[in-house]
Amino acid sequence: METKRVLLLLSFAIVLSISLGDEEFANQSHDWKYFVFSQWWPQSQCYYKENADSLADQSFRIVNDYRFRNDCVPTYVENWTIHGLWPTLNGTPHPGWCNDSWKFNESKIEDLKSKMMRQWITLPDSSESELLWKHEWEKHGTCAASLPAVSSEHAYFLQALTLNRQTNLLKMLADKGLSPSDDNMYKVEEFEDAIMKEYGVKGRVICVKERGDDQYTYIGGIRICFNKTFSPIDCLVTEPERCREGEALKYPVIIRA
């Protein structure tokens, strides 16, 4: 009898230990310190598509396929658009998928959709924008929701739209001498310096490369980091992505059909 009792207690202790361990792991995996706010230059998105089956994959490639037109930007899109607002820990966009049961509900953002179709779209095919919103909410928004300011689907998307409007990258860069051009090329560090001059922090430049030798490199995106009160802070990862310091970038003019 005593042996059976000991075995039962031991089994309970093991189960409790595993349970607490899982809970501790879950808490750790959901921890984050700041936001990475990623924005795209829409014209550069016309030149490439995803090289994977998921919107989560960041491996893009230029396509020279007649099915993907370089005049893909809708007439109502004129500024930099949102890629995502990502809770981040130690320089990587983690955690992710923090609540599998909290699915994207488009009706929750019905009043924001007209703004989102101008500020948060997928290119070259804007008809897939709702898939991007779904992905961004379920992967990143459910983790951001631990912060009261963005604790609902509506609040999360509204905050990202607000940051996009406040940063106004098209005007900010133009004020620093960086405007879309068919002729001018800009160095990677000119974009980095513009972020530093405007916000006093280090951001990150994301580039897009054409396939083949001696092809152009485009400015594809800019990432600016914010703390949990949405004040700009230095990003932990600041080296350019898919390009290098000193490299010349095209900042293409939006092509209209």
Regions found by a protein language model. Give the residues of each.
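Beta-sheet entry/capping signal
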Residues: 6-8, 34, 79, 223
